[in-house]
């Protein structure tokens, strides 16, 4: 099997204003080579809270465009990583993952416990879904992100994952403790339970694939067959740069986040 080239984004914890907070990288697995294409060092990054605006996160593609999410802005790049455009919305805050289906790009708006939809043809945010809970029942409320009647900033469930395909929309967060599915009538159901603090949970191959971040493993849980857990690599302390820096915004080793299915 030929090894792929992948595009990855990074978040650099502990950076100070004016320093690099991450970037976009082209990773050639066959040649064992990494090339940085974009350096994220903007000076207007929000420094409140752990991580927050820092770095670049979700990635999606259209035929001739590369879409990358920052905390409160969606960027469009050419295949040669030239900036084409950027798009903001007052209800987009602390975005993590994005997912495309046809001409719609779905984004997690973590700060608002919401999912937003961006129309790739019209180049505007056209739809929003706010998640809350009434007792044990999940509640989804639609809103128009172009108006003023949207939700308040809450971040109760820390929605950090959305996946859209022919089977529908699934999403989850650090504090949902379940993979959630959105039905056509806007009802929300639980697909399965999830460990607290996981990332990137998605249906896959009749089961669920996720970063079980608290356990430092990538985990596949089958409905009927065997389950698999693969440890996230841990490197010798002596090989690490800036080791010993004690800051609550520094990510620890083995912290698994980000999944790309290639076959």
Residue ranges of predicted features:
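Short loop/turn segments that connect beta-strands within beta-propeller blades
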Residues: 29-31, 78-82, 119-123, 182-186, ...
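Blade-loop segments of beta-propeller domains
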Residues: 36-99
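Short coil/turn segments that connect the beta-strands within blades of beta-propeller domains
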Residues: 2-6, 63-64, 102-104, 166-169, ...
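Beta-rich catalytic cores
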Residues: 20, 55, 94, 111, ...
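Surface-exposed loop and turn segments in beta-propeller and other repeat-based domains
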Residues: 34-52, 88-91, 125-155, 228-252
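Conserved beta-strand position repeated once per blade in WD40 beta-propeller domains
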Residues: 57-58, 97, 161, 199-200, ...
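Conserved beta-strand positions in repeat-built beta-propeller and related beta-rich domains
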Residues: 8-19, 28, 67-71, 107-112, ...
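Loop/turn-rich, solvent-exposed surfaces of beta-rich toroidal or solenoidal domains
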Residues: 202-263
């Amino acid at each position: 099997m030929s090894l792929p080239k992948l595009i990855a984004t990074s978040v650099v914890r502990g950076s100070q204003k004016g320093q690099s907070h991450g970037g976009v990288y082209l990773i050639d697995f066959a040649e064992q080579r990494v090339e940085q294409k974009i350096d994220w060092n903007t000076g207007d990054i929000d420094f409140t809270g752990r991580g927050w605006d820092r770095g670049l996160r979700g990635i999606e593609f259209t035929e001739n465009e590369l879409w990358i999410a920052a905390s409160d802005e969606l960027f469009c790049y050419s295949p040669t990583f030239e900036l084409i455009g950027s798009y903001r919305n007052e209800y987009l805050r602390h975005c993590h993952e994005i997912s495309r289906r046809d001409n719609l790009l779905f984004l997690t708006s973590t700060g608002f416990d919401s999912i937003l939809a961006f129309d790739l043809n019209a180049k505007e945010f056209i739809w929003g879904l706010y998640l809350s809970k009434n007792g044990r029942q999940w509640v989804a409320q639609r809103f128009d992100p172009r108006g003023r009647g949207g939700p308040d900033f809450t971040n109760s469930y820390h929605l950090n994952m959305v996946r859209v395909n022919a089977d529908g929309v699934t999403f989850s967060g650090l504090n949902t403790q379940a993979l959630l599915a959105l039905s056509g009538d806007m009802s929300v159901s639980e697909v399965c339970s999830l460990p607290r603090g996981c990332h990137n949970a998605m249906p896959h191959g009749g089961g669920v694939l996720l970063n079980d971040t608290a356990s430092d493993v990538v985990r596949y849980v089958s409905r009927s067959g065997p389950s698999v857990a693969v440890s996230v690599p841990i490197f010798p302390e002596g090989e690490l740069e800036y080791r010993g820096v004690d800051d609550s915004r520094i990510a620890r080793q083995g912290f698994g986040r980000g999944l790309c299915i290639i076959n």
